[in-house]
Amino acid sequence: MAVANRVVSVAIGSDTGGSVRLPAAYTGTVGFKPSYGRISRNGLIPYANSLDTVGIIARNTNDVTALYKILDKHDPADPTSLRPESRARIHEARRKRQVDFGHHYLEGEDTKITFVGSRSNKEIPANDSVPKDKYKRYASGYFRRIGVPDEYNIAEMHPVVRQAWLRTLSMLVDKGHTIVPISLPNTKLALAAYYVLAPAEASSNLAKYDGVRYGTPRNPNTADNENGPLYANYRGQHFGEEVQRRIVLGTFTLSAAAKDNYFIQAQKVRRLVQQDFNNVFAFGHPLLPHTRHQNSSSDQTVDLIIVPTAPTPPPKIQDLQGQSPIQSYINDVFTVPASLAGLPAISIPAAIDEDIPATPDRHVGMQVIGQYGDDLSVLNFTRYDIEGTMNFDEARELTWSRKRM
């Protein structure tokens, strides 16, 4: 809220499953989760070690990029921070990719994407017929192949969000980019896997906050009974209800009776989600040699993926208070897959239908997802091709600077 109300220009926060991107989508700001390990987590209270990422919130992509470039460096104090050798491999992979950047931009099948439940039932050409002599460099580089996953096009999506997604893709087609339908089949399992893995890691990480060596000092007047459990009352007083719920859930999934059926299976799903992304990106994972060049010449691969950040506009407090935990977890359905795969993802305010009044409770965020290590491509594309198309000084009104297509 400090960024949204112009109290500060930028802010940082942890993004484990969408905790930076979702607030940004709900407040009309820009929220960026970099690739896992790019920014040091030193000083951050760990929640889920394999998922926690320091993210950035600002009112525009330029400010996000400026802070990211400052923070993007190895920190010996953080064991999850990318080492210089890994950063060098990523840099070299991106440099080689730039040399061949336009080679796979070929005309493919005349496929179309139809949006479920769209008021206009408008179809977007999946392979744009932009003349080949127009494939030249401009502000953000070459024209891109934009992936639209079929699994994100759900019937439960709010009409306002669907229309914003449709208009965003239409604007990109108008600029010369190619829309490519893709499939991420294991996306439907990602949310369930996340809510097994994250609580399991949290139950381990937060166990140390017992008032003995970590946490606030124990108050003798409220300490556990002499013959009772040592930590129960203390932890109950200092952890919120949702945190306690996740600790209990995580402790159960790590138990001998449940570990094989839940935790191990969730780890397998996570690997499948990562594999799905590697299969569709033209830029192979720079730290996984077997994926580095496997897709570079395929006509069905993409440079970036664009999906909504959340399936609904911002929920109201009174609605959240009446939700069950399961209902609240569903809001993470579009942000969790990128977190499981450790990919860079940014949420940016999107244009809603001009026929629907733009009000504070109708903020919509679009999410741009890139391959691991391709953070700057995500930031530059968002800055020049999406943000540059909008009247961003009036981002809260969510209007485009040009007429509707």
Model-predicted regions and their roles:
Residues 1-71, 341-349, 363-365:
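Short glycine/serine-rich loop segments
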Residues 33-163, 229-233, 391-403:
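A short helix-breaking turn/cap at a secondary-structure junction
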